[in-house]
Amino acid sequence: MFRAAAPGQLRRAASLLRFQSTLVIAEHADDSLAPITLNTITAATRLGGEVSCLVAGTKCDKVAQDLCKVAGIAKVLVAQHDVYRGLLPEELTPLILATQKQFNYTHICAGASAFGKNLLPRVAAKLEVAPISDIIAIKSPDTFVRTIYAGNALCTVKCDEKVKVFSVRGTSFEAAATSGGSASSEKASSTSPVEISEWLDQKLTKSDRPELTGAKVVVSGGRGLKSGENFKLLYDLADQRHAAVGASRAAVDAGFVPNDMQVGQTGKIVAPELYIAVGISGAIQHLAGMKDSKTIVAINKDPEAPIFQVADYGIVADLFKVVPEMTEILKKK
């Protein structure tokens, strides 16, 4: 039996929504916005109330202009200074605290990337609140869902903190539309440089393949490949479909590939349209990082491998025969 909410309850709920306001911390590289920020904006809009976005950097005018066009954002706050080079958390934290104090935001969030995981615990500590990490759903302005036990269980968290600080798993929310918005832009609160650390340099690996967390197709290899040289089989296959290449923790620990390729609970979380797992047994830590993929194809010679339990399509065969055959077929198409 359902009971209609009393008019007083509805008025109180509407009043609470009017007072909700969320600050999204933008992750970017000065000239381009990190895709996970768009997913975070979508999560923020589900809280109700006004959504603002804070952009800090050295030359971030283009990113700020792009954010003004994103659907769901009411205001873009821009802070430009040399100390924000590299988006160091030591410098960003005072800026975020000053912005929160000025506008009295009820929620502060960022993507659950290395950037967000490095920044938000510091912000929460300064606000003297407990942060919530890696949320996958929002039930209400004070109730969030996150995974525990390597993704095998869901935990619903009710947060009574005065300011809710949380990071968002990008694969759990659609990206916000990059057009249709008309947000205003203004300068953020000025803060004095902390200067307890200095950004020196960053060298990015250049590749014709897409970035792992944003790719539509991912080909990942495990210990079954037996060596780093054999990962060339996956590179050849991936190049036929403009796919990214990942790896299991076992392959990374064995020294086959660098750890920036690791997919899993302690690596990167991916949810591509197609995920091809080659020579991966399917430890729960790996499954936690890829089980939200739309279609999963597993190739393993062991028919009892756990990876087949989550796969949509399974091939029980020797990967050293199957993968080259797949590559040749795709080359002809």
From Swiss-Prot:
- Which residues get modified to Phosphothreonine? T93
The Swiss-Prot or TrEMBL record annotates one GO molecular function as:
flavin adenine dinucleotide binding
How does the cofactor attach, per the note?
Binds 1 FAD per dimer.
What are the start and end residues of every segment in region (Domain I)? 20-204
The cofactors required by this protein are:
FAD
Chief location: mitochondrion
Q: Which residues carry this modification: Phosphoserine?
A: S140
The record's Gene Ontology biological-process terms are: fatty acid beta-oxidation using acyl-CoA dehydrogenase
What gene is it encoded by? Answer: ETFA
Could you identify this protein by its name?
Electron transfer flavoprotein subunit alpha, mitochondrial
Q: From what organism does this protein derive?
A: Pongo abelii (Sumatran orangutan)
Q: Region Domain II: what ranges?
A: 205-333
**Record-listed N6-succinyllysine modification sites:** K59, K69, K158, K187, K203, K216, K226, K232, K301
